């Protein structure tokens, strides 16, 4: 499943996305937890989630259940 998250300059939503990924146990494959421009991979017990950020937007892709959990956490603040 793929989902658009926010505009690239929506830093509040980007922060909520990173918090949700951490809360769900995601391990970032990169050297930095920041979401700079590019493709970022996060590993979870239930699979891998990718986050793509460019100059215009941020989106995620991964297993349906995992993407749904992330969307729930960033949209209304519901915690696991």
Descriptions of predicted regions:
Residues 20-24, 73, 77-80:
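Conserved short hydrophobic interaction patches
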């Amino acid at each position: 499943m793929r989902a658009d998250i926010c505009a690239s300059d929506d830093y509040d939503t980007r922060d909520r996305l990173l918090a949700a990924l951490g809360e769900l146990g995601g391990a970032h494959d990169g050297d930095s937890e920041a979401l700079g421009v590019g493709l970022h991979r996060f590993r979870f017990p239930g699979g891998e989630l990718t986050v793509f950020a460019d100059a215009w937007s941020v989106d995620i892709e991964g297993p349906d259940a995992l993407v749904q959990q992330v969307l729930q956490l960033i949209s209304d603040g519901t915690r696991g």
